């Protein structure tokens, strides 16, 4: 705390006052000192309030740092999971494409075999007609 040094002497009327006129009749403390003491008490109260605020700020910052760290770890885990799932989707997509290609081949073979079966059936029918 700053110590206040007066720049001017006390006014003459205060200097001429009797000592019992300058002190509190209840506690015996000089009014001039009492005034400074009360002002210091107010400053201390304000500083204590400010300290509580800053202490709360430190605690809040610590909690926020912990939360940030936790969220950063979660984000990294989500990135890893996302990459893994993206790769899995790609693999499944490739398998699906392969199965679709295979299905198209089998479908063409089936169509070709059905056409051959129709031809064979007609040939058989004609053959039976001719030899019956």
From Swiss-Prot:
Residues 37-116 form a coiled coil. This is Protein LEKR1. It comes from Homo sapiens. Keywords: Coiled coil. It comes from the Eukaryota.
